[in-house]
Amino acid sequence: MSEYIRVTEDESDEPIEIPSEDDGTVLLSTVTAQFPGACGLRYRNPVSQCMRGVRLVEGILHAPDAGWGNLVYVVNYPKDNKRKMDETDASSAVKVKRAVQKTSDLIVLGLPWKTTEQDLKEYFSTFGEVLMVQVKKDLKTGHSKGFGFVRFTEYETQVKVMSQRHMIDGRWCDCKLPNSKQSQDEPLRSRKVFVGRCTEDMTEDELREFFSQYGDVMDVFIPKPFRAFAFVTFADDQIAQSLCGEDLIIKGISVHISNAEPKHNSNRQLERSGRFGGNPGGFGNQGGFGNSRGGGAGLGNNQGSNMGGGMNFGAFSINPAMMAAAQAALQSSWGMMGMLASQQNQSGPSGNNQNQGNMQREPNQAFGSGNNSYSGSNSGAAIGWGSASNAGSGSGFNGGFGSSMDSKSSGWGM
């Protein structure tokens, strides 16, 4: 005659009644039907309070000597399965914990001066439950500083708010994580893309409809006045990143998609690369004001590589043609340019005196340094540029600056 025995996964859980066979045994398959992965049963001895195992023979569980009774039997699992279950539970707990940690204060930038904390709370309450709002004010005047903070209860609400722009009291505002909350090692991947080469007949609705084929579009923004580009924000950052670098056809026009990098990231890159060009040292190619051998002071006049007689000011290249154009412009403004240019008989040679730049100079003595040459006198000074490797190129040039101490006049001569 069959009977029901009480089986549970843990002693603290509510047991389940499982039927036995007519001979009083219980099939292991009956147990695994309710507890997948089970491999046996155990119970606590009422006398010794120790756990005892139930005898298992060829998939059949045999009752203890005193019968099944009213005892509660606990399911046994293989150690590997139990370890996997524990790891799964721990992983789930960590995921839940991380999700809770991600919910944090959001900074709201670009607030109108008239916006109050109550206005801010009423606006963001349309997205979800708001835990806190704050408008930062000046301690002395009590006026708004133009930004504030907001915190939501649900992380999903936070993501939704961050993925779009907000019109608050007639002004567009941005809502994002403060810089201090963002990990420098794992920066947040942007969900916003830059759409270049747009035309004026493209509307926000048309762009939204086009990009919706790739994923959920949270926001479309076309700057006013029109500047031939737009921004599209997706709900999924992976979709946004997958489109970066692509050329797409919208209304018969090819548009280019790239990452919408924040302004502060671009500024940091400029700071890392230096102010004038990619090399440290301001003007020039190797620090200081130039790198001419022999103690010269040319502004980035790279010796040995200036085959065409041009000059390189860091990231700016100036060739003889440009210098000639500058000369023409100066001559139209300075009446004495022609006179000073004709008096350049004391200009130093534009030659190969690479070792004379460090020599002791007497008044009226000309000297040269690599691609640079100089001459000095009691009444004036001239600076000339030339190229030691200009032979046959016809692209060398000389320039000088003359200064008359007597007439108190100055000018450029080329």
Swiss-Prot record:
Keyword Transcription attached: yes
Annotated positions of the Phosphoserine modification: S183, S292
GO CC list: chromatin; mitochondrion; nuclear speck; nucleolus
Residue ranges, compositional bias (Low complexity): 342-358
GO terms, biological process: mRNA processing; regulation of circadian rhythm; regulation of gene expression; regulation of protein stability; RNA splicing
Bias type Gly residues, positions: 275-303
Chain spans, region Interaction with UBQLN2: 216-414
Gene Ontology MF term list: DNA binding; RNA binding
Omega-N-methylarginine: residues bearing it: R293
Placement of covalent cross-link Glycyl lysine isopeptide (Lys-Gly) (interchain with G-Cter in SUMO2): K79, K84, K95, K102, K181, K263
Segments of this protein annotated with the region Disordered: 261-303, 341-373
SMART domains linked: RRM
Annotated keywords: Chromosome, DNA-binding, Isopeptide bond, Methylation, Mitochondrion, mRNA processing, mRNA splicing, Nucleus, Phosphoprotein, Repeat, Repressor, RNA-binding, Transcription, Transcription regulation, Ubl conjugation
Localisation: Nucleus; Nucleus, Nucleolus; Nucleus speckle; Chromosome
Superkingdom of the organism of origin: Eukaryota
Post-translational modification summary for this protein: Hyperphosphorylated.
Bias kind Basic and acidic residues: ranges: 261-274
InterPro entries, per database record: Nucleotide-bd_a/b_plait_sf (IPR012677), RBD_domain_sf (IPR035979), RRM_dom (IPR000504), TDP-43_C (IPR049124), TDP-43_N (IPR041105)
Segments forming domain RRM: 104-200, 191-262
Domain remark text: The RRM domains can bind to both DNA and RNA.
Protein role: DNA- and RNA binding protein, involved in several nuclear processes. Binds the conventional octamer sequence in double-stranded DNA. Also binds single-stranded DNA and RNA at a site independent of the duplex site. Involved in pre-mRNA splicing, probably as a heterodimer with SFPQ. Interacts with U5 snRNA, probably by binding to a purine-rich sequence located on the 3' side of U5 snRNA stem 1b. Together with PSPC1, required for the formation of nuclear paraspeckles. The SFPQ-NONO heteromer associated with MATR3 may play a role in nuclear retention of defective RNAs.
Quaternary structure, from the entry: Monomer and component of the SFPQ-NONO complex, which is probably a heterotetramer of two 52 kDa (NONO) and two 100 kDa (SFPQ) subunits. NONO is a component of spliceosome and U5.4/6 snRNP complexes. Interacts with CPNE4 (via VWFA domain). Forms heterodimers with PSPC1; this involves formation of a coiled coil domain by helices from both proteins. Part of complex consisting of SFPQ, NONO and MATR3. Part of a complex consisting of SFPQ, NONO and NR5A1. Part of a complex consisting of SFPQ, NONO and TOP1. Interacts with SPI1. Interacts with RNF43. Interacts with PER1 and PER2.
Protein's UniProt name: TAR DNA-binding protein 43
Species lineage: Eukaryota, Metazoa, Chordata, Craniata, Vertebrata
Gene: TARDBP
